[in-house]
Amino acid sequence: MKITSGLVALSLLVAAPAWSQNRTTPSDTQIRAILADRIDTRKQSVGMVVGVIDAKGRRIVSYGALNQGDPRPLDGDTEYEIGSITKVFTSLLLADMVERGEVSLGDPVSKYLPPSVKMPSRNGKEITLLDLSTHVSGLPVEQESFKPADPANPFADYTVDRMYAFLSGYTLPRDPGEKFEYSNLGGGLLGHVLARRAGTDYETLVRRRITSRLGMKDTAVTLTPAMAKRLAVGHDAGLKPVKNWDIPTLAGAGALRSTANDLLTFLAAELGFKATALKDAMAEQTVVRRANIMPSGPGAPELDIALGWIVRKDAGGTVIWHNGGTGGYRTFAGFNPATRTGVVVLSNTNPDAGAAAGDDIGFHILTGSKLSEPPQAHHEIVLDQAAKEALTGRYQLRPDSILAVTLEDGKLFGQATGQEKFPLIAESPNRLYLKAADAEITFTLGPGGRASSLVVHQNGRDVPAPRMP
């Protein structure tokens, strides 16, 4: 299938970024120019909205369209699928339920499932609610043998019974808590068991515990007719409209839709600009639970995991953030506690893996890190069958992402965990590039000419990935 899951959306590359000399927050004009470049020049989106909040207030900058040929303007009330940013809401539910005494972080997940479901364990260690929130459960990104009836809406037919059957028969590859590995299944399962504990469904729980308390009227799984009229149409990397995603069973992993204004309201509460009874739960949610989840080279950002949030620390400062993606959308939400600035970036296009999807815009506004460079010109060559086969395999790009290089009908493809499959074009026997993105891959060829590792080059960054056994 073309899309396994855009719900996995952590940045692929985390090598050392460069910072601009001017650390002033960009003006509306400067932000609009960035969006115009992404839409008009790079053709990486159809319509984007950026929201910024700080002590001076909030502002919305938009560019592009709801759909190709749709004259209606984008604004702060335009609806987008926010994908994995939903996991932040799910983990806030967890923190709030801990505050209320309804659950504990160390509770085994099995406590909140039917007796007929056999949760996997290993060496006497059970998966806990904390393990699910911090992606150290040992559960895979999503169910192995995940075969949707409709690849364009891949989670629509994934049922609770299928999830229960998978869990009951799954063997953990490692002890729970041992290693960070991003898991949509884990995020969705967390939302499921919290809703079971509360005696309701996930959407109702989010509305009762979070959105109604914060006045977020435009954040929901199921859109009202009025909200649906404001929904930006999602697009694929070729800027063609795609279906919206329905995620009934794994709703806690990525089912929410929202707007820039609503997400800025959420960040206002995180930053202390909006009084809320969720204050203590939000503070608890940002406590780092595991440091340096993606070890990298000198000067590279440190990535830590909190409850649902990713905490990025580098020379530009600390940013608490998450991003998201579904079949036709890419999103970013984050805040800088030191400067008390929050940023939301929403795009109604899911570009090819490797293309700038909006994260760099968010970090640029929050810390002054430089924006991604536009794709460069390449020259294609033809490789013989043996040369292509030597490059195929699975490479450990980062703990939460494997890059699979496959050969199908004589053509090479790459697919990072949770991303679209994309064609790889050769410009030398050991160097491939993505057509629609500023990303290249260099392979190290071992004995016999078989690739032993690769390096992904993107936005001036180089990240090595060894071949997996």
Q: Which ranges hold each PLM region?
A:
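Active-site helix/loop module of the DD-peptidase/beta-lactamase fold
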Residues: Q30, D70, E81-I85, M97-E144, ...
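Second-shell loop/turn segments in exported
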Residues: N22-R23, E79-E81, S116-P120, A149-P154, ...
